[in-house]
Amino acid sequence: TWSMLQLMWIKKHEPEVMEKAARAMFVKDYVRYQLTGVWTTDHVEAQGSLLFDNINWCWSEDLCRMSGIPISILPPLVKPTDISGHITAEASAITGIRAGTPVINGATDTALEAYCVGAIHENNCVTKLATSGTIYLFRKEAHPDPKALTYSHVVDGLWYTCLATSSAAESLRWYRDTFCKAEFAQELQGGKNTYRTLDEEAEKVPAGCEGLFFHPYLMGERSPYWDTKLRASFIGATAHHGRGHFNRAVLEGVALSIKDNFSLIENTVPIHEVRIVGGGGKSPLWRSIMANVLNRPILKYANDDSSYGSALL
């Protein structure tokens, strides 16, 4: 994401590297290049680079010129569903995959996670509880918004508006690693899953945590505030609050942060339900909190991994 800025940093701080650069690749495209020897990327990935022209559907010569990025190092563009190449004999010898096996181009994790949970129609909505948290709405036309990100989908004719909070499941991981070290050490020795323990304690606490609130701005915040200086905090703590309150406050704080973003799109089209993906969605309690905060049914699917979505393509 935002590869233009990364390439500009390299150009400024490591100019000798940029001078030698012949090809720029996204991570998945590099893996596919090693498998097939073919250098391509997809439009969804390209849009996230900030170097793509959404009007003419190609790399932007103007943006490349303004940023100083040679357009010649950017890969050819193909559809996510297109076959980019085939497994080479060399790759077959290393991986065991049959030589000649076709390899599709693929797309970004977000687009493929949405695809594998059936977000393929207008007005479908998906939320993601991973390191960061997202909420995205699919529509037939692009709706650019200065507070949001806009991408095309892997399904022709669909676009999605993407809004993101920077620390979703990352907030819970930070909380576990910082305040539950003993439990986590036991888990690593074959003991009970720490997240399950935290959920069980949080389930005993009423909604609202009896006045305890958590702001999940551990790494600043993206939408809707776009402020790197925002900071996380627990507010309203009293002697009455126990660990279960703090556990639940983290879950509720993340859900409310996603609600901040959802409020920008929830009244634009009818949204009857929200599909959920990501590791945080494995928690029944967190799903319940999300359903209450968003005031929508939350749909959980057995398979919601981007690799599964790529296989479906």
Locations of regions flagged by a protein language model:
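Activation-segment/catalytic-loop signature of the eukaryotic protein kinase fold
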Residues: K204-Y308
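Short, acidic/turn-prone active-site loops that include or flank metal/cofactor-
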Residues: A46, T131-G133, A302-D305
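Short, small-residue alpha-helix embedded
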Residues: L172, Y308-L313
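ATP-dependent carbohydrate kinase catalytic cores
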Residues: L51-W159, S166-S167, E183, Q189-R196, ...
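Gly/Ser/Thr-rich active-site cleft segment
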Residues: T1-T108, L172, P216-M219, N247
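Alpha-helix C-terminal capping segments
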Residues: C116-E122, L264-E266, V293, L313
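A short helix-loop
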Residues: M4, M8-E14, K20, Y33, ...
